């Protein structure tokens, strides 16, 4: 791991639990909160991918709102503008996974540069990490907005190279999303897949370099590699 100089983290689902919006969904739709959250996230991802394919970019906030409105129509729920705003704002106050803040500090203390590389807008990324009190742990908060295309497009991953000023082989990419880890691997990043659910990886011609249960294991990865530099 001595060749790794920086780490780029995905935000949604990797550092932060996207389903921490369930509480707000449950308040609005009693007994159906988890169902709403699950379909909402599914459509949010689909809309970012489809818009990239169609070259019809909108901000992540807009894609999130569109996905919520679809979800409510699909499930037959009324959703006025005020309720839509409350629910979408919950995406700005996601809960970090418990191990994330202390492990980020440990990684920084090792001299590694850290960044978020997210499909979120600059505003949404800043709000999420700021509300969680971990903004200062990152050297860069990288949004795909400048290239107007979402991960897993190559141009999105290239933003991390530009921000760090490093070759992609020196940047470890970390994501809990199999499609994201696949895209990063095709781009040429050494890649950790955070596999909290014990799932099988996607069948798209790539495998992650490391299949880990959580962010804690990244620290242990560097611990075990001290004094050696295993190839990726």
Curated annotation (Swiss-Prot):
The entry's keywords: Hydrolase
Where are the stretches annotated Important for catalytic activity?
175-180
Q: Does the keyword Zinc-finger apply?
A: no
InterPro entries per UniProt: 2-HAD, HAD-like_sf, HAD-SF_hydro_IA, HAD_sf, PGP-like_dom2, S-2-haloacid_dehalogenase
Where's the active site on this chain?
Answer: 10 (nucleophile)
For this protein, the record's PANTHER family field holds: HALOACID DEHALOGENASE, TYPE II (AFU_ORTHOLOGUE AFUA_2G07750)-RELATED, HYDROLASE, HALOACID DELAHOGENASE-RELATED
What name appears for this protein in its UniProt entry?
Answer: (S)-2-haloacid dehalogenase
> Taxonomy-wise, where does this protein's organism fall, top ranks first?
Bacteria, Pseudomonadati, Pseudomonadota, Alphaproteobacteria, Hyphomicrobiales
